[in-house]
């Protein structure tokens, strides 16, 4: 059994902020298993690695003997979380929310322990709440308090509309903690206002206020913007293992350490520190660290054998040796007369523009099935299939079809 100090170290790994740390320590000291809550609005059907930052932290609480509550915001999902938004988010239909919620339940147990997980829906209590009850709840905070939120303040100052239902969202999320009697609530750094709302409402309803633990927002594949499906810089946890491996191997070396801190169970803090020292000293290649992480992620969301097969496929491309047929086949539509190589690279998503493709070709940084291609006039038409590689990290197995 972990000591209090060991528990605090594991809980604090990668965390941005814990409010209040002394309250968390006191609750851990009591020896009573904590009720740890995190809410997810089912606004899209699939989860990605950015979502797993919170799920991973929930799993760590489970490993310490605590009960976690995976709260599906089927009610709040129909409101639309305004956090960080400059415009009003379009609410989802009940049918969309429920369809997405079903896929969430299937995916989360790739990480969470079923025996220590409650799956709850906040329509359980809000579906029974009367209009009078909702008005009483809304009376707990003022418009002035709501305008303390950065996103609301910016929209108000910029004379952008703020719908009344958006003001209700933090209150509704906060009341979830009351309904669930949460001891701890987890959320991203963009959720701090909403999480603190839960503390205040719990005190109002005579409960001990929950501890708030915020986690950083995971940067996506570009290493800059928050991981997001809309930006295309994400890895979905339901993606094929080969995609998980190849995408992970493309991330920048600096981002690797961030991902290890927030996504890895297998690489301890001490081991990550040793890896950093070895890389800095030239005794370890950053690629090998990245491969360790890629193997862990592919195994977690698939299995060890599938992960090894995916790694073999990735290795076959980067070395020019081995079987590349395990790589996913991407169909690219081209006109009957075909495309020149620069246009093909752009159409396949391997370069952002034809000018960048031309630059890569002149640098002899483009290979097709392991052979360097630098003929700018070379044409490819329907029926072509092969592995195209741009630089060391960017590649795809493509098949050209008539558009």
Curated annotation (Swiss-Prot):
Q: Which UniProt keywords apply?
A: Aminoacyl-tRNA synthetase, ATP-binding, Cytoplasm, Ligase, Nucleotide-binding, Protein biosynthesis, RNA-binding
- Enzyme Commission identifier(s): 6.1.1.1
- The EC category is ligase
> Which InterPro entries does the annotation name?
aa-tRNA-synth_I_CS, aa-tRNA-synth_Ic, Rossmann-like_a/b/a_fold, S4_RNA-bd, S4_RNA-bd_sf, Tyr-tRNA-ligase, Tyr-tRNA-ligase_bac-type, Tyr-tRNA-ligase_bac_2
Pfam families attached here? tRNA-synt_1b
| Biological process, per Gene Ontology | tRNA aminoacylation; tyrosyl-tRNA aminoacylation
All copies of the S4 RNA-binding domain together span 339-400
Q: Which molecular-function annotations from GO does this UniProt entry contain?
A: ATP binding; RNA binding; tyrosine-tRNA ligase activity
Which positions does the motif 'KMSKS' region occupy? 226-230
Does the keyword field hold Glycosyltransferase?
Answer: no
- Output the NCBIfam families linked to this UniProt entry: tyrS (TIGR00234)
Its name, as the record gives it, is Tyrosine--tRNA ligase
Species assigned in the record: Xanthomonas campestris pv. campestris (strain ATCC 33913 / DSM 3586 / NCPPB 528 / LMG 568 / P 25)
């Amino acid at each position: 059994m972990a000591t209090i100090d060991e528990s605090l170290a594991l809980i604090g790994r990668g965390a941005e902020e814990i409010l209040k740390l002394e309250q968390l320590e006191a609750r851990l000291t009591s020896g009573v298993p904590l009720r740890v809550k995190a809410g997810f609005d089912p606004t899209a059907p699939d989860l990605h690695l950015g979502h797993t930052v919170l799920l991973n932290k929930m799993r760590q609480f489970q490993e310490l003997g605590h009960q976690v509550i995976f709260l599906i915001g089927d009610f709040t999902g129909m409101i639309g979380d305004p956090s960080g938004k400059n415009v009003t988010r379009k609410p989802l239909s009940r049918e969309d929310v429920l369809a997405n919620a079903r896929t969430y339940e299937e995916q989360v147990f790739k990480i969470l322990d079923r025996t220590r997980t409650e799956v709850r829906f906040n329509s359980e209590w809000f579906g029974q709440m009367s209009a009078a009850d909702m008005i009483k709840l809304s009376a707990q905070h003022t418009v002035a308090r709501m305008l303390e939120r950065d996103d609301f303040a910016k929209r108000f100052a910029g004379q952008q509309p703020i719908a009344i239902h958006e003001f209700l969202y933090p209150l509704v999320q906060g009341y979830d903690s009351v309904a669930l009697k949460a001891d701890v609530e987890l959320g991203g750094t963009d959720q701090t206002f909403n999480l603190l709302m839960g503390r205040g409402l719990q005190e109002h309803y005579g409960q001990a206020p929950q501890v708030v633990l915020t986690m950083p927002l995971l940067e996506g594949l570009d290493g800059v913007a928050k991981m997001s499906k809309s930006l295309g810089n994400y890895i979905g946890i339901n993606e094929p293992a080969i995609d998980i491996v190849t995408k992970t191997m493309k991330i920048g070396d600096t981002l690797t350490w961030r991902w290890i801190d927030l996504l890895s169970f297998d690489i301890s803090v001490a081991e990550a520190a040793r890896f950093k020292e070895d890389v800095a000293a030239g005794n370890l290649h950053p690629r090998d660290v990245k491969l360790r992480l890629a193997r862990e992620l592919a195994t977690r969301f698939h299995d060890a054998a599938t992960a090894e097969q995916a790694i073999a496929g990735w290795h076959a491309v980067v070395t020019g040796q081995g079987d590349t047929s395990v790589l996913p086949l991407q169909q690219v539509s081209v006109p009957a007369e075909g495309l020149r190589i620069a246009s093909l690279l752009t159409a396949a998503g391997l370069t952002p523009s034809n000018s960048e493709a031309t630059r890569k070709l002149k640098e002899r940084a483009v290979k097709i099935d392991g052979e360097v291609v630098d003929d700018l006039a070379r044409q490819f038409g329907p029926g072509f299939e092969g592995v195209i590689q741009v630089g060391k990290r960017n590649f795809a197995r493509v098949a050209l079809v008539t558009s």
